[in-house]
């Protein structure tokens, strides 16, 4: 069974939550997508704000072949050469900042002549992590952290539309803890909701802040100091500090220490 975050992944822009400055009515990226014409661009924003989802929605909307490359698992030059022959596809590169200079260099020709439309996603400042020639050939769009209203909308959508959760009686009595522990990350928020619901055997699941805190202490979410969660949790830790949230900061710090940081 797919995780809740994957089951709830939006398929259209109308279902996409947040980033109204980019995909809301009349916004620049929305106009390009509706017109069926996009150029290569890079999405820069924190984890869990919809970068990958937006790229997939664009590919579906334009009915264009969609391919993904990973710096960790791909032999970029060989894989890219194969993709470039697929008829002007969209190439999505998540965490493009992890690509080496030579890996990024290998994309320049295809991006410049339009053989491929590149959509890169990064949590790091592209000015420092993406080579200048590639950055100059791409538009840069900044994705913002999800607002409280966005996260609450996502929670309501989850408990009312998900094929599994809607079969349960779920009452969101309190949401402060879930929002705080999510660090503004939609994927993390849904993971927390799924954990809390699955661990409750009552006929009606009444979600409170104390309940969420207790469940997370009993079932700490995964942390791998050498993997992707390392960066996600550091990001949540920094957001808690900036947001003057001492409880959240202590929680994320404890997660890092427990994980061997």
Predicted feature residues:
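C-terminal helical "lid" of AAA+/P-loop NTPase domains
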Residues: 176-181, 187-201, 211-217, 235-239, ...
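Conserved AAA+ ATPase "SRH/arginine-finger" region at the nucleotide-binding site
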Residues: 70, 139-152
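Conserved AAA+ ATPase "sensor/coupling" helix adjacent to the nucleotide-binding pocket
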Residues: 137, 150-166, 195-199
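A short helix-turn-beta junction within AAA+ P-loop NTPase domains corresponding to the substrate/partner-engaging
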Residues: 64, 131-145
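Pre-Walker A (pre-P-loop) alpha-helix and adjacent loop at the N terminus of AAA/AAA+ ATPase modules
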Residues: 1-46, 249
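Conserved catalytic/switch belt of AAA+ P-loop NTPases
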Residues: 102-136
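Walker A/P-loop
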Residues: 1-2, 31-70, 84, 108-109, ...
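Short glycine-rich substrate-engagement loop in P-loop NTPases that contacts/grips substrate
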Residues: 22-26, 64-91, 101
């Amino acid at each position: 069974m797919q995780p809740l975050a994957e089951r709830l992944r939006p398929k259209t822009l109308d279902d996409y939550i947040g980033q109204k400055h980019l995909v809301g009515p009349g916004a620049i990226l929305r106009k390009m997508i509706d017109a069926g014409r996009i150029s290569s661009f890079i999405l820069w924003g924190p984890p869990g704000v919809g970068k990958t989802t937006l790229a997939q929605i664009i590919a579906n909307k334009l009915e264009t072949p969609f391919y993904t490359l990973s710096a960790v698992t791909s032999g970029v030059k060989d894989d890219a050469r194969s993709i470039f022959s697929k008829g002007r596809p969209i190439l999505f590169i998540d965490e493009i900042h992890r690509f080496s200079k030579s890996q990024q260099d290998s994309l320049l020709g295809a991006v410049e002549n339009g053989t491929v439309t590149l959509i890169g996603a990064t949590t790091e400042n592209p000015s420092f992590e993406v080579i200048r020639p590639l950055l100059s050939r791409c538009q840069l769009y900044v994705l913002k952290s999800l607002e409280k209203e966005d996260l609450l909308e996502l929670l309501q959508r989850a408990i009312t539309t998900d094929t599994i959760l809607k079969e349960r009686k779920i009452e969101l009595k309190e949401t402060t803890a879930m929002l705080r522990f999510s660090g503004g990350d939609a994927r993390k928020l849904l993971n927390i909701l799924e954990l809390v619901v699955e661990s409750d055997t009552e006929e009606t699941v009444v979600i409170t802040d104390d309940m969420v805190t207790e469940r997370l202490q009993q079932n700490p979410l995964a942390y791998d100091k050498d993997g992707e969660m390392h960066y996600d949790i550091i990001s949540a830790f920094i957001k808690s500090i900036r947001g003057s949230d001492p409880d959240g900061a202590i929680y994320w710090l404890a997660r890092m220490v427990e994980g061997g940081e």
